[in-house]
């Protein structure tokens, strides 16, 4: 046992326990806080450095430690925390103290009394040292925040349980760290004092006076250091005094804007949550509500008085938000309160109590003025909500706001408490009288808890009773319409059923509440107008006023605050309308009414609309007098908004005729400089301005065309507000002098690094071995690869140069005066170049030519010089003029562009060849412009590197070299000929000399012979004989001396001639052999070291003297080396290759471990694909090879159930998509349900099929369920196997809202969707399906009790349609039932279509039998509802796909009456089944007179009578005719989108010829429509339908209401860019362009990408050409060098669409497929189990019913709802979920009350219903428990499991949002509701 305790695991666990203990962690954090050294350490070091004595050191240390101890204590002691945490109290203490401190240090003897007592504690200076250290330790974290490590303590506090132990240990840790730090400082000081080398420094010794002075002024130095550090710390927070105040918008402007935008009032509150702000860590913004709009910034708490019926009242009276202005009670206010209290005797006592409670009231104005964190400085960020709202919404500090709240009657900490509510509660607490704020006793708390339970139970009981009563009414055979809970309407006359208009009805909310414009109120504020008594609007206003409660009654409720909600009081008072309607109208006061919540903000925040009504009194003369308008105040939580409407610079510029505003723009936009590129002095409109609207902005005068020049670096201003302090940038690294983008170190791997951080093994190996293995075919790269690498290198080089240019440009832009210096230098260089340098060079050149006796070229040079133009350009290079400088060029910068730059040439008359001339011409054409640099050089681009100028002397040198070469060539030829001739001459001369010598010798011989003969003859007897012994031994030589020849000849003359001939021949042979041997020897010496062989003509063999062995060895060596030398290269190659492969394999194998999971995933994916598509290999639409792999996400565990979806097998884009988060989450929930094993106990089945009698489940309902196939009673005992993927896949296949194609899914970004809905308002076109000859149904449709028709105003259209909600309810109910009832029947309809058994039942799907589509689309639902604009969000990437490229097809608009592209109906390909079927279509015909599009009426199309198209390819035209159509009515060419959608669905069925079949080139379209036409077009259909509906449904409405609707729609559609009204004189072209860009430029119609740049380049050239008298030459030159593009110029005025497309100006292209891989795609894959190929869709033909289109305009949701409740066979109930009887709000309330289970007081088991059987009473209201039957309580668990999916996740989100204020939908756990129970699977 002892050994076990010493095991490593136990030892480690023990160490971990010790390390994680509170004490150790506290010590650690305390030790860390030592290093947050702030200004407080300066005093501590000062006492030690100045050597003021031990007393001062001790007092400094004591004060320092005491201050820190107080800081630690303040964490728990609330009063101390409040005292130290209030910024104004700290400031009030610090500022005088700092002043005193500076006086103290500057006047050393200010407090010196001349004598000190012995008791050092009484010494004032020592006490001041103590106070200094104590106080600055306290100030350190608040007025001088050091946020480095101080927050760590507070962070860990929330984690540990024993908090006091943690604080104590952290203080001890801080103390230890502080002692160590002080010891270290003491050691350093001691070392400095003891170090002799420092003290004996010559400089110090020579400056003893300086040292003493330094010692004396040490205090001042410390005060300066303290001041510097204080300023540094103050730099991190906004200064409370030195801030830029915002100028407030004027009252009238603000009022107009407010009322136009929906009267969003903004409330004020003072600094009351300073402590909370510090506690919660909000360093940027206050959390609470915003200030009132019409208040002066410097007088926050002054209440603006409003005159109401002759009485003065403050806003506090009308505004129940209780501004903190109670210190300023006016007598009027007191009187009003006393009136409201009536004759209360204790009124004065209450006022005294209330005033006693307001302590320090005199301090409030100053404190609020300085420290109101809502007002005293500008906000850090300003969120602009697309100009829909008057002021921007303020960010709350956090969604995690901690406060106490009551849940289950107990006080607990809420982590998501609304901060505004917390502030409001705190303000309320200050206003409630002392008697009500007494703490309750435990008995009181218990009673309160019981009361809470009782109230909840009472609510639940009432709801349950109502629910049961409604169900019983159904059982008795009542009509469904009578049983369903209906909307309450405010009626005026019960008999005539005359209700208020929807906009005025307080009971309606959501889309029915339009916005009422109040701008007319300001014009009549002080007037009273008379109108006739039959004015309907006035009547309605009067009626509303008449039913309101009196002010006295309501005011009493307001001031008592008995704990009940005020909104409840209002509701109660509205319910008692009948009682109050009889009261006198004159005594009514107007209060807060009609505060209806409405979610129109895109960020899930709620704002409340308040509607003003005028009090109208009727006088006897039948005329009504309208009093002044009173804006109603309201009760409710507001979205906090910034007080001011701040505008950007660009926003202001977009208003053309805006007056000159003196105030600055509030928001910093991206740093841009406006450069005027054209000023039209003649007020002529520039015809080309509309082409460059994206890049140009008209100035205020409308005469100047300006370009914006943006800085080429990161936008560090990022919509910051001027005057606001921005937080210091942290987590950013800059390692370059001018870094364009500042990144966090987290993203270093994603940025282009200047030096490589990565160690690339393969790249290094390539660099090392590239030369050695490059020739090996295995390692050789292809030519395309080489070209690609070369292209990449070229791009990198280009990018590098571009970055260098940007860096230089930014350098000049950032350095002060750099632009002025550079501009001046450029102008000087331009003048020098043009008028001094170039002329002097021309003169020097021509003088030099004359000196060299050549003709001068004065004329040519001066002509080229005069052609050179120095054009002044903007900083971006936009050419202006030769003489005109850009505006503010000294500050904004300038470029000088040289057109036709002069190049000095040594001669102009080129005598070169034609090819050289052509080359020169090309070069000249390319380089005929440049930019001047500050050094006088030429650059191709602004700030580019200087290019090489053609040298003047280079051609001269070339010519000189050519001439030298020619001379050399001639000399070489001469020498060659001369040598040849001399050689021949020498040879001849040699032969001649030999001949002469021979002759001479012959003569000599003859002469000798003659002399000899003469001598013999003379002497007679004497004869001389010569000796010949030496003849045989003589050496053969070429020389024949006369002596030897004479000797030989003397022997025998005939013998001599033969011998001489042989000798001569031998000599002639030997000479060339000897020469050849010498040459070979010389050549071999270069390659091999050969022995020096002396070859002479005397030796007959060269190798005779070499030993045989040596010769043999040398021969072998020579042969071996000769073989080895060619093989050596291959040997080295193979060796290096082997090394390379080994290293490479190792480098590859390294990530193999990490890749295994991915590979397994891939294998599983292949298995899944094989599993799913095993029967579909031969089917169309699936490209197996192109399937994308699932990106590895480790959170998905059940990989085998995830189907991989590729681009190719998702071919359906017309499936229904619900783009709200709830349906996605619900789909995911169903997927999770499908993954879990189903229980073997099916209690719901037994619940339904039980024989007992229950009040809810009747036999009639059971029979109805049985006939519908919901369950089979005979199959109740069958066991349900586990749900496999196939079953759920087959069932979900029928639910088209889950068949989300990848194209659709990739666009379902919820935020984008929400924004898109609000931005792209659509005119919905609905058609409804009507049952023949059903009078009841017609009456039901006309009944106004179920109001699901949608108001077509744009303000309303952004809300989700009720039809979708009804469809969702229906789908969820079906799925729930099928999930529960699955497996009890053989042909369970999960496998097939829903409810196959009842053939005549109509369901909202469309079924096809013969050739079904890949996915179901509902036949009776407008496809526009799920193929609208909001789903089509353009993306940038266009992956390869097998779809048609639309750019090669030129469409043309057509009006063919026989077959229109527009007449594609729903996906009914089997038209033959119902010959008389009338397909519901919405046709879109393009009519030239009206503009772009015009909506026709619904056409009834009989496909049998349709004319066949001329080109019918295998019957596909008929299929194309009935393709699904998209509702792109507000787009440019809607039929193209439909074609594309159809083509994408089945790309193989639409022949290309048909797409381009009808060409009508003569039909031309104007691409622009006027602004007024746009409004007219958009409202035309809507107004007609609105009028119909108003006339039918609301007989009380009149033309004025309709006018309001129209104006609303118009107003909401046009953007409001400014605070001021837009002028009506806006040019038509600008309006057209705005409309065009806003509507159609986004997705479908786009310019050619290079076209934008071409147009910008054209504009740059136009700017120059417009200023020239004769622009022809410059224009031609610009076209030649490609600066001006003629194709981009619209020369023809009227161009057909086909022409525009042919020219490449317009490109029609589809919305591109997205390739985003994110979490949403993973969710999509979970739903992807529903995707099955079309061949598996087998449905019942009987399910299709005959329907026809009705002309009337009704919302489709009526049928949807009706089909769920009313059936063809007259059964009046089809309630899959009984709670659908109730309205949505009551349903939600019932669910929440049931889920809370308030009777269970055990906090741990929140939902005991799921955990034990005791909670089954929650279901008792649905089912009467039969006491005789032994019913298992677990049956009700199954009932809960069935009901809960119908609770729907959006309901849960609503519960979170409104009950628990959780804004984020992912924080479901905050609600403490367990969604799904854990079951034990038996």
Swiss-Prot record:
Xref: InterPro entries: TIC214
Chief localization: plastid
GO biological process: protein transport
Bias type Basic residues, positions: 1616-1626
Biased composition regions of type Basic and acidic residues, renumbered to the chain: 263-283, 1578-1615
Keywords for this protein: Chloroplast, Membrane, Plastid, Plastid inner membrane, Protein transport, Transmembrane, Transmembrane helix, Transport
Residues spanning the membrane: 18-38, 64-84, 87-107, 124-144, 172-192, 221-241
Compartments reported by the entry: Plastid, Chloroplast inner membrane
UniProt feature, compositional bias: Acidic residues: 251-262, 293-304
Membrane topology: Multi-pass membrane protein
Pfam families assigned to the protein according to its UniProt record, in alphabetical order: Ycf1 (PF05758)
UniProt keyword Plastid present: yes
Location of the region described as Disordered in the Swiss-Prot/TrEMBL record: 246-308, 779-800, 1578-1626
UniProt function note: Involved in protein precursor import into chloroplasts. May be part of an intermediate translocation complex acting as a protein-conducting channel at the inner envelope.
Similarity section: Belongs to the TIC214 family.
PANTHER family in the cross-refs: PROTEIN TIC 214-RELATED, TRANSLOCON AT THE INNER ENVELOPE MEMBRANE OF CHLOROPLASTS 214
Quaternary structure (record): Part of the Tic complex.
Protein name per its UniProtKB record: Protein TIC 214
Organism annotation: Illicium oligandrum
